[in-house]
Amino acid sequence: MFAVRHLLKSRKHFPYAYAAATTTKSTLPMPAVPARVLIGLHTDSDCRNKRLPQIQELSFRKMSSLPTSKKPGSLLEELYAATKPYAQLMRIDRPIGTYLLFWPCAWSIALSADAGCWPDLTMLGLFGTGALIMRGAGCTINDLWDKDIDAKVERTRTRPLASGQISQFDAIVFLSAQLSLGLLVLVQLNWQSILLGASSLGLVITYPLMKRVTYWPQLVLGMAFNWGALLGWCATQGSVNLAACLPLYLSGVCWTIVYDTIYAHQDKLDDLQIGVKSTALRFGENTKVWLSGFTAAMLTGLSTAGWACDQTLPYYAAVGVVGAHLVQQIYSLNIDNPTDCAKKFLSNHQVGLILFLGIVLGTLLKANDTKNQPQPALTSSAASSYASLTQKPEVLS
């Protein structure tokens, strides 16, 4: 017992001997021998050298198992990491698609404005929000259809669904939320616009399938992406003026075929290998000829829409600038250079903006033209009739 008491009193000098003595399960009395004997006749330095790594590892495990307080900002970092794949799924980091979807809506809203008036800012805000939401929903639908195809294409293999960052079930749940938000925006419009807007959903859903069956998926994309050319006018006026909206819509379809064909040339080698079709493959080396034809059709449609709306000089000047912009794109395009194709595709945001500004300025100028128009002269018969109406009737007494 003397040895035990001595060991307990001197544990700060012999930590490893104390650990060995106190953890022994034997019920036999402790022999009165020096502490060095209890641990196998090793010296303090020998014990420390052999057991120190084990003690350090044990301490590390205990410390790592203790709850640690979160660093400032760690919650935001976790939230960012959790939401980043969904933001990538709806292409928040690449807003060009939202712009290209919004501009036909903005054109239609601006064309429908009364002479001398600015376009309806509330409608522009609603359609801008709707473009952001529905473009994201369209990307989700596209990636759900093309998950296996995207995994085989160099440019798209890192997309959240193709790379496995998001499961198919989670993507469907996310799509439901997107469509619900889109419906919430749509119901802010009149009932004619609600029906017209809902009817475009079929095009949005079927577009990704078209690249499997036809070389013209860009045509279907154009029909879906430019639906706002019809919807914008209906939202502000309660009906669609086909004389103005139909040529505007067809112009937008031609524009989409132009810029999305340029876009599709980035992936044409991968598309050939996996059997995906596109206008880039259909046009081939004659791409510039085809794009020139669609550009001419677009400019013709825009001129027709402007004539139907009694547009003024700024509008037609903008149409001319748009034509020059597209001609420069096509002339300098290198269809075998993916970087150049991407650059030309992105520049189409400027096309939409230029035309929108031309519509706004042309509509504002319409009021001045109306005021400066000479009043029609009265004919002699009309003048005599007017004079007789202004004479006071005789009073019979």
Swiss-Prot record:
Function, in words: Catalyzes the prenylation of para-hydroxybenzoate (PHB) with an all-trans polyprenyl group. Mediates the second step in the final reaction sequence of coenzyme Q (CoQ) biosynthesis, which is the condensation of the polyisoprenoid side chain with PHB, generating the first membrane-bound Q intermediate.
State the HAMAP family in the record: UbiA (MF_01635)
Specify the pathway. Answer: Cofactor biosynthesis; ubiquinone biosynthesis
The protein's location, in the record's own words, is:
Mitochondrion inner membrane
Record gene name: Coq2
Transmembrane residue ranges: 96-116, 121-141, 169-189, 190-210, 213-233, 242-262, 289-309, 313-333, 345-365
Membrane topology, as annotated: Multi-pass membrane protein
Q: Which cofactor does it need?
A: Mg(2+)
Q: Where is the transit peptide?
A: 1-14
Record-level Gene Ontology MF annotations: 4-hydroxybenzoate polyprenyltransferase activity
Q: Which EC number(s) does UniProt give? A: 2.5.1.39
Q: Catalytic activity, per the record?
A: an all-trans-polyprenyl diphosphate + 4-hydroxybenzoate = a 4-hydroxy-3-(all-trans-polyprenyl)benzoate + diphosphate
Q: Which InterPro entries match?
A: HB_polyprenyltransferase-like, Prenyltransferase, UbiA_prenyltransferase, UbiA_prenylTrfase_CS, UbiA_sf
Superkingdom as given in the UniProt entry: Eukaryota
Q: In its UniProt entry, what is this protein called?
A: 4-hydroxybenzoate polyprenyltransferase, mitochondrial
Gene Ontology terms: biological process: isoprenoid biosynthetic process; transcription by RNA polymerase III; ubiquinone biosynthetic process
Q: Which family does it belong to?
A: Belongs to the UbiA prenyltransferase family.
Q: Which keywords accompany this UniProt record? A: Isoprene biosynthesis, Membrane, Mitochondrion, Mitochondrion inner membrane, Transferase, Transit peptide, Transmembrane, Transmembrane helix, Ubiquinone biosynthesis
Q: Which PROSITE patterns match?
A: UBIA
Entry's Gene Ontology cellular component terms: mitochondrial inner membrane; mitochondrion; RNA polymerase III complex
